[in-house]
Swiss-Prot record:
Annotated organism of origin: Yersinia pestis
Gene: sthA
Record GO terms (molecular function): dihydrolipoyl dehydrogenase (NADH) activity; flavin adenine dinucleotide binding; NAD(P)+ transhydrogenase (Si-specific) activity
Keyword list, A-Z: Cytoplasm, FAD, Flavoprotein, NAD, NADP, Oxidoreductase
Disulphide bridges, residue numbers: none
Similarity comment: Belongs to the class-I pyridine nucleotide-disulfide oxidoreductase family.
Reactions mediated catalytically: NAD(+) + NADPH = NADH + NADP(+)
Designated name of the protein: Soluble pyridine nucleotide transhydrogenase
Keyword Cytoplasm: yes
Amino acid sequence: MQQHFHFDAIVIGSGPGGEGAAMGLVKQGARVAVIERYNNVGGGCTHWGTIPSKALRHAVSRIIEFNQNPLYSDNARTIKSSFADILNHADRVINQQTRMRQGFYDRNHCHMFSGDASFIDANTVNVRYADGTSDTLQADNIVIATGSRPYRPVNVDFNHERIYDSDTILQLSHEPQHVIIYGAGVIGCEYASIFRGLSVKVDLINTRDRLLAFLDQEMSDALSYHFWNNGVVIRHNEEFEQIEGTTDGVIVHLKSGKKVKADCLLYANGRTGNTSGLGLENIGLEADSRGLLKVNSMYQTALSHVYAVGDVIGYPSLASAAYDQGRIAAQAMIKGEANVHLIEDIPTGIYTIPEISSVGKTEQELTAMKVPYEVGRAQFKHLARAQIVGMDTGSLKILFHRETKQILGIHCFGERAAEIIHIGQAIMEQKGEGNTLEYFVNTTFNYPTMAEAYRVAALNGLNRLF
């Protein structure tokens, strides 16, 4: 028998955006319902995206570290692990994350509904359960935090047993010797690192003229060189004409006339917002061609009581930003406005091997803006900590205004880059004279540390001034 429930707010989706919104609402005293279509909370971030891919990457990087460090191994003793082996590690992390996040909802008395959500009208949502039954929920405010999914062109047979997207690759059951990755964005590059780290041949097909073009060009070039040096074959400015599944693999026919064959293919070219099936037509909302919703600065859609956060609104499509967006939407919902907003310079972390992380402007952007900047660099190979741990590939680059010494951008390539970047970000976010390169010269760092790279880079940059 169908039941009817009323809440202060309904949150559709339990990924980072949904969690941020739900926690923000209950902490302000709201009675909240959370609808999650999957069996467990956490969304795509926990189950198919950020968490599993980073867990896989970590496992592979530790294998590489062991095999390359003469302290641990020699030619007669190396570690070899299969994709299935490292998937076990990812599964353990996923289970830990799921239990932890379920605890958040339980402790804060969120009302959980496991089913598919669709709008009946602007304040009413139907929840359809796996057994075919349904309930009706009503609320004064609703948050759409349904995330995104891999884009699947209609002319690619994703039912073929050797053709995967970034969700289904976690179900890889055979041990490939050769993988084609179509799409050289963040996901494609991260999986190229993972597979190559397992000694799998990798063909990385890039539809653009360089890798990760949004990065500072030096960082992009460093990744390209590192891939090349480790045997990844990169094919730039290529598009597929046909993707042909065979009995023992996949053949990609490129528009340039070339053909590439491998054991399997990972299609990682684009994502689509999860808005189909939500019944948006029943409330007068319409997603764009990529399934994304348009919102204002408080994450309100065209309907002021319906909010949207996370991947379903597009850029920046980061788990970190999605959580903050959810918190901001919750504050706006309860108080009528939000007194916090996303920071202007959101850091990016790309978990290739080695990592890449950036915050602020690139050299190319500053040159186009005609900003008089200077560069300070530190090579990891010159840091005692990097030498001790045997991870001396990489560098830190600080861009600063040559007159005011204000930090304008920070770019890091190397192990722990995504952690290292936040030291510089903290100074960049200071107002007025607090944002200065000289902070790194005038403070004392622990020694030996990777953080010391900031002092080295700052001194290097200041020595360039005249």
